Amino acid sequence: MARITVDDCLEKIPNRFQLTLVAAYRARQLANGAEPLVNVHGSKDKPTVLALREIAAGKVGLEVLNRGHA
């Protein structure tokens, strides 16, 4: 798979501090068994890399931080 960069993710979430929070939260969800939202067949990517791939693909955004705080 192509290498993911922080710049790819910053196009979706321009604030790097919010990007860090979203990536960490989503990586924790993936590590706890959540289904990946991007195609991963046979990929050995760690949850943090998967989270960044999902953000760069536009599948995950700031909305994950607002869930449960309604």
Curated annotation (Swiss-Prot):
Describe, as the record does, how this protein assembles with itself and its partners. Answer: The RNAP catalytic core consists of 2 alpha, 1 beta, 1 beta' and 1 omega subunit. When a sigma factor is associated with the core the holoenzyme is formed, which can initiate transcription.
A GO BP term here is:
DNA-templated transcription
Per its database record, what is this protein's job?
Promotes RNA polymerase assembly. Latches the N- and C-terminal regions of the beta' subunit thereby facilitating its interaction with the beta and alpha subunits.
Sequence similarity = Belongs to the RNA polymerase subunit omega family.
| EC number from the UniProt entry | 2.7.7.6
Specify whether Nucleotidyltransferase is a keyword of the entry. Answer: yes
Q: What is the lineage of its organism?
A: Bacteria, Pseudomonadati, Pseudomonadota, Betaproteobacteria, Nitrosomonadales
What is the name of this protein?
DNA-directed RNA polymerase subunit omega
What GO cellular component is one of the record's annotations?
Answer: DNA-directed RNA polymerase complex
The record's annotation in HAMAP family points to: RNApol_bact_RpoZ
Q: Which Gene Ontology molecular-function terms are recorded?
A: DNA binding; DNA-directed RNA polymerase activity
Q: Which UniProt keywords apply?
A: DNA-directed RNA polymerase, Nucleotidyltransferase, Transcription, Transferase
Q: Does the keyword Cell wall biogenesis/degradation apply?
A: no
Q: Which reaction does it catalyse?
A: RNA(n) + a ribonucleoside 5'-triphosphate = RNA(n+1) + diphosphate
Per the record, the gene is rpoZ
Question: One short Pfam family name for this protein?
Answer: RNA_pol_Rpb6
Enzyme category, top tier: transferase
